[in-house]
Amino acid sequence: VFKGAFAIWRRDMLVLRRSILSEMVAVVAYPLTIYLAFGIGMKGYIGLVDGVPYSLFIAPGLITMTAVNAAYSESTWSLWFHRKVQFTIESYRVTPIAVPEIVIAKIMSGFSHGLVKGLAVGLVIFAITPFRFSPLHLLAYLAFLIPGSALFSCAGVICGTVMDKPETIGKVEAVFIMPLIFMSGLFFPLSSYPATIVPWVRALPTTALFEGARQALVSGGFPVVSALQVAITAVCVFAAAVWIFRLKMSE
């Protein structure tokens, strides 16, 4: 099963390699601007948040945001472009590559984009700050970042499969994806919400992702329930992505 998926993934990685410099500049600019404006520019006015400097509080969230947003965007636009413009998906279907392999390949591509771009932002942020983390903290953080990127990559495959107009894809990102990211405690602790809303926000897998990733990287904690929530959601969305893509291709 993975031989065909790996071939498609390798093709997408070769495309990324050709434009890696421009991609890195573009992807680093936005989170770095936010970090400089809020993390450094306003840290004197905000003070400590959950016992840590505000610039440290938002750093893991910005890295995670970059990774999952890149994973989602790559999966969505790559699949849509190859399905509606280049018709590469139709070319894949006349080869011995099975439908699940195409889905797995696109998920792997989005996932890889997310990790590479998240790493780039992390290196830049760590280069301009005095904050350092132990390798064990980083391993705990990756336990959230990897399934989180896979989750958003699977969601991107679903959007790229069912949506035929690029403006619709843009609306979904603006109305659903970005609010889910920003509402999950990226810039503020969940305690800022009214007590009646907190349980609903905590039920979101994105909250488990961002809160768990922050705890893992900053304090070395590992909230098992949050990690399981992210991983189980990723598996469910993956199954949905395969089913929806197979259904779409059978039309």
Q: Over which residues does each language-model region extend?
A:
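Hydrophobic transmembrane alpha-helices and immediately adjacent juxtamembrane helices
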Residues: 1-211, 215-251
